Amino acid sequence: TTCFIQGLKNRDDDYSFISLEACPNFYSQAKKYCEQSLSDKIQILHGRIIDDEELIKDSKEPQHSDFLKTDRNNYNTCVNVWDEIKNQNFDVVLLDGGEFSTWAEFKKLQPITMVFILDDCKMLKNKKVVEELNSSSQWRLVKASNKRNGFAIYERV
């Protein structure tokens, strides 16, 4: 979030930046840390774009059950803002969200997004996204790395 804000705040064109955070603690931290940069153009919202029933729930990893419980609890603390943003087109979307929500978020955002930046590509949350983008003729891999948990950037062709 900070990197995006630093890159945008000196621009004078008509842009909009929205960061969504479902976790109340992360939302509070982000809002406090970025407080000086927030404006009509730069917003951090405590919200989500999918509902509980859209979360991945069939992970075979035992440790995932605790993470899923936490994600579901976080979802109960915030509102779904999809109806407020679904008619926008996004130049860039960074998918670095929840382990169990990212696939459903990607499916909603894919038709209205030009560039996806994916963090943690080797993890559950973005593995399936990478597979879909790699197999599609509508998307081109711009950059990828296997360092840490991996990242990738895809652009609509």
Q: Model-derived features: where do they sit?
A:
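S-adenosylmethionine/decaboxylated-SAM
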Residues: T1-V157
